[in-house]
A protein has these predicted regions:
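Hydrophobic protein-protein interaction segments
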Residues: 122-291
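Recognition helix of helix-turn-helix/homeodomain-like DNA-binding domains
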Residues: 15-32, 38
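Helix-turn-helix/homeodomain-like alpha-helical modules used for DNA recognition
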Residues: 55-133
Length: 301
């Protein structure tokens, strides 16, 4: 019965002859990659895991790279994919997210329109294929601002979240803003608007650290590292699923659902707590000092 079902599926989906199907099912002729992909999708078989059985040291990554030919559409599609994925697990009581970050995490700043616009502008300016030479020239579609806020909202649905920050997370963005201001690509007026967003974000984060909870009631733990990070690593997990993320090219991240990569990345992120000070709920003096230092850095703009 199972053999007959497989034969019928192969014939229906691949439009190949009866004898050709028999030879494939008997193993006399290998399936092509295209045929294997169709069967994988129809039967819910993971080709990644099948391949991983033979190549145990390899992991398959999704690049999630924003294309310069259709920048806003691909960026919107990537954020939409994350929003939908997080929405699917939001009711799971085991959800957890963790990020070790050397830049301001997107999950915290994307709801601020001017600040998020600056991050997009920086990426576009670096990309020679995109003609965007001044901050004023960049017009962000309204749907981008909306999906960014949806993304922030969905990350706050995780039952527990750990943020481990490099102690220069604000310094990095302040230097970027100052650079673009000095080469006259960001006006003084726009610089002040970005500065206002940064100060507002600082106030929000200090309040968040004091409470140790989002407005959703979900737990947040914030740590400040005493060592520098070379990259930003994140993961989102439930009791039966997970995804690992590594930040690349400023606004992009490569992702994988590989089990081995997840275990390794989670272990690395959690190990950074040994070099860090928790400033959420406890550590009031360290918390006050850290955020006052960030305001001083921002006010140099």
């Amino acid at each position: 019965k199972e053999y007959r079902r497989q034969r019928q599926m192969c014939r229906r989906d691949r439009y190949i002859g009866k004898e050709a199907i028999y030879r494939r099912l008997r193993g006399e002729v290998p399936f092509t990659l295209a045929e294997a992909a169709v069967i994988s999708r129809k039967m819910g078989i993971s080709l990644d895991k099948m391949i991983g059985g033979s190549f145990s040291n390899n992991a398959v990554f999704d690049l999630n790279v924003v294309h310069h030919t259709n920048t806003f559409e691909t960026y919107h599609d990537i954020l939409t994919k994350y929003v939908n994925a997080f929405d699917n697990i939001r009711e799971d009581p085991t959800t957890e997210m963790a990020t070790s970050s050397n830049i301001l995490p997107q999950a915290l700043y994307l709801k601020h329109d001017v600040l998020s616009k600056f991050r997009l502008f920086k990426w576009m300016y670096q990309n020679e294929n995109i003609k965007c030479k001044h901050f004023d020239e960049l017009e962000i579609p309204h749907k981008i601002y909306n999906i960014q806020k949806d993304f922030v909202n969905m990350t706050q649905q995780m039952k527990t979240t750990d943020y481990i920050w490099d102690n220069t997370v604000f310094e990095h963005v302040v230097r970027d803003i100052q650079f673009f201001s000095e080469i006259h690509l960001v006006s003084e007026e726009d610089k002040e608007l970005i500065k206002d967003d940064l100060l507002l974000l600082t106030d929000e984060l200090e309040e968040l650290a004091g409470k140790g909870k989002y407005e959703t009631g979900n737990d947040v733990r914030i740590y400040i590292s005493n060592i520098k990070f070379d990259a930003t690593y994140s993961y989102v997990a439930t009791s039966n699923s997970h995804i690992s993320m590594i930040r690349i090219y400023s606004i992009n991240a490569i992702t994988t659902q590989d089990d081995g990569m997840f275990r390794s990345l989670k272990e690395w992120v959690q190990s950074l707590k040994k070099f860090s000070t928790q400033i959420s709920e406890s550590g009031e003096m360290q918390r006050i000092r850290f955020f006052n230092e960030q305001r001083e850095i921002i006010n140099t703009l």
